[in-house]
Amino acid sequence: MIHFLATLCGVLFVYAVVSIVDYFFNNKHKENQEDMMTIIHQQWYKERRALIVDNAHLGMVQVAVPDPDLDDNRIQGKADALIYSLWVDEHFRGYGVGRKLLKRAEWEAKLMGCKTVCLEWDCRETPEWVLRWYKCMEYDAKRTDDFTWLLTKDL
C-alpha cells in the first residue's frame, strides 16, 4: 500500500509539473505570456533596477541601468545595462523559462533607453553549458581573465 501511494504521489507530481509547464510556457498560450511575469522597478543610488519574476515562481532575473547623468554610465565601458541573477528552478530548465526571462530583461532594458546589455559569466560559479547557452542567445563573449567572460549584446 505504501509503495502504491508513493507511486501515485510521484505520478501526481509529474502531472502537476507538466501541467504548469504546458500552461505557462507552451506556445498555445502566447497571448498570456506578457501577463505571466511580474516586473518591479526600483530607483537605487545611481541606477535603476528591474526585477522580473515569472508568476509560477520558476525563475527570475534582474536588470540594472546606471543613471544617464553619470559621467561614466556604461558598464565596463561596453554596455548601457547589466543583466544579472538569471535563475531558473533546475526542474524546469529546458522548457524555455530562462529564454523568456532573458528576453523580457532585454526588453525592459530597451524600455529604459538602453541600446546594449551585458552580463558576466564566471567558470568558478556557473557550469560551462550556461556560457554556451548565452552564446546561442546571440551574446558576444570575450574573456576578461582566467575565470571570467564578459558577454554583450546589441538590442
Q: Could you say what each language-model-derived stretch is?
A:
Residues L111, C123-T144:
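Conserved active-site alpha-helix within GNAT-family acetyltransferase domains
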Residues D140, T144-L155:
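Active-site/acyl-donor-binding loops of N-acyltransferases
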Residues I83-L86, V117-W121:
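Conserved hydrophobic beta-strand within the GNAT/NAT acetyltransferase core sheet
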Residues M1-G10:
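Feature marks short, highly hydrophobic, charge-poor N-terminal signal-anchor/signal peptide-like helices
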Residues V88, G94-W107, C136:
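Conserved acetyl-CoA-binding loop-helix of GNAT-fold acetyltransferases
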Residues N27-Y84, D89, T144-D145:
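Acetyl-CoA-dependent GNAT
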Residues Y15-H29:
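Cytosolic-side junction of a single-pass transmembrane alpha-helix
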